[in-house]
Structures are given as structure tokens and as C-alpha cells.
Swiss-Prot record:
Any Gene Ontology biological process: translation
Keywords from the UniProt entry: Ribonucleoprotein, Ribosomal protein
Protein encoded by which gene: rpmG
One term of GO molecular function: structural constituent of ribosome
Name of the featured protein: Large ribosomal subunit protein bL33
Gene Ontology CC: one annotated term: ribosome
Pfam families: Ribosomal_L33
Family matches, as InterPro entries: Ribosomal_bL33 (IPR001705), Ribosomal_bL33_CS (IPR018264), Ribosomal_bL33_sf (IPR038584), Ribosomal_zn-bd (IPR011332)
Alphabetical list of NCBIfam families matching this protein: PRK00504.1, PRK00595.1, rpmG_bact
Length: 50
């Protein structure tokens, strides 16, 4: 199965807030989204971590 579960980590507080799936065959780079962080209480950049 090519899809793998990944975690998204806040760029400011380093808290792992979100989890999602990713197809590693078609998306080789790291994902980055602008998401709401409950700890920071604002929209921040969330990057993929293992």
C-alpha cells in the first residue's frame, strides 16, 4: 500500500497537531500547509515530520 500516515508539526511551537496520509510515489517532497495551531491560537506553517 503506497499511502503512509504522516504527522504535521507546527513551525512555531513544534507541537504535532494534525495527521494525514501521503502517497510517497507521487509526492516525493515534504508537505507544508497553513493550519490553525490550538496551542499558538493562530494560523501557522505546519510541516511534515515522521
Amino acid at each position: 500500500m503506497p499511502r503512509e500516515i504522516i504527522q504535521l508539526q507546527c513551525g512555531d511551537c513544534k507541537d504535532k497537531n494534525y495527521s494525514t496520509t501521503k502517497n510517497k510515489k507521487t509526492t516525493t517532497g515534504r508537505l507544508e500547509f497553513s493550519k490553525f495551531c490550538r496551542k499558538c491560537r493562530k494560523h501557522t506553517s505546519h510541516k511534515e515530520v515522521k
